[in-house]
Amino acid sequence: MRRSSDRILVSHAGNLPRPADLDELIDGGRSRESAERKEYHERLPRAVSGIVDRQIELGVDIVNDGEYAKAGSYGGYMQERVVGYATVPADPSRKPKRAGTAERDRREFPGFYASGLWFSGSGGPIRPGFATPGEVRQIATRDTRACTEPIRYIGQSAVAEDIANLKAATRGKDVEGYIAALGPLSLGAGIHNLHYNSEEEYMQAVADACRVEYKAVTDAGLIVQVDEPEFLTTWSFYPEWTVEDLRKYLGFAVDVINHALRGLPQEQIRFHSCWGSGHRPHVHDIELKYIADLLLKINAQQYAIEAGNVRHAHEYHVWEEVKLPAGKMLMPGVISHATDLVEHPELVAERIVNYARLVGRENVQTSTDCGIGSRVGHEEVVWAKLAAMSEGAAIASRRLWGR
């Protein structure tokens, strides 16, 4: 991946607003044989070309396909690309593998969670696959998802299409391309294993499946962004855990992630994690200082971590004590997905400089906290946020390089 010696490079963390006609095709094309699905695949290359051009216009240096091929939640697309899972009847004798999302917060703010507001974006229209404000999702209790047979990746043609569309859209343009791909924890850690002899064997199989997708991306000369929010959100699923319990688990998690990354070029790998993109209090998020050293054991060249919202913006101080290894880079989020307020470019610049002064200006690139296409209320606000990030990066570059 590109390392700049004269300015701060700009990227973002994932999904971007999709054209309305593409959303309609996705919503109508759930059947594999539908006419809408065929039309969707014909429309997709032009849509990706358009969003790449839009990113370039807004000053983004490391661009993606907007995650246009990934309808709904950030990880749902893998249900079509990985087999080995099935819906099975719930077994009253089998305890839930873990608590629900944000259980620590949920216990302190039960009324807020009952409202369902945290499922929504911060306002405005909601992309297909996301709940509308105030709607409470009802989760069936009579069945559950489980691993019932060997885990295998079957998404080769789908990821090949993702790669082809992005490479065509970036050809001849002075940008790098990246594709986001789900991490093994986020794919499999919350699902019961009914097939393998142990959790370790099961999660290694999940990692093997993920690796097929990662390798396809890196073999194509693109950057793979491993999307692994569960590196930071796992704490919320186990309210009885101590920090020591979490660190023990994350030691195992690092091994799983590195198993998925084995043999792949670190210079094409960026690892992204966050504290979950739900609009919720986040008062019980695990603090970065407790796990930053474990994060750096992941075999990636770059670490993209949520850092722009009001709960975590102060955590650049962690890097006063934790030393970034030689050759590694940080990509702090300096734009928040949690608000429709557009960050001032001066604030963006200040955030960038805070990191650059601690880890070195050549070791910092800039990003959003998470994908903002689905969580910010309107696409006009998304474009304004990306423009503010680019302007802030330019201001920071002048301060850091003196020109």
Mark where each language-model region is.
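Domain-level signal for soluble alpha/beta catalytic cores
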Residues: 1-403
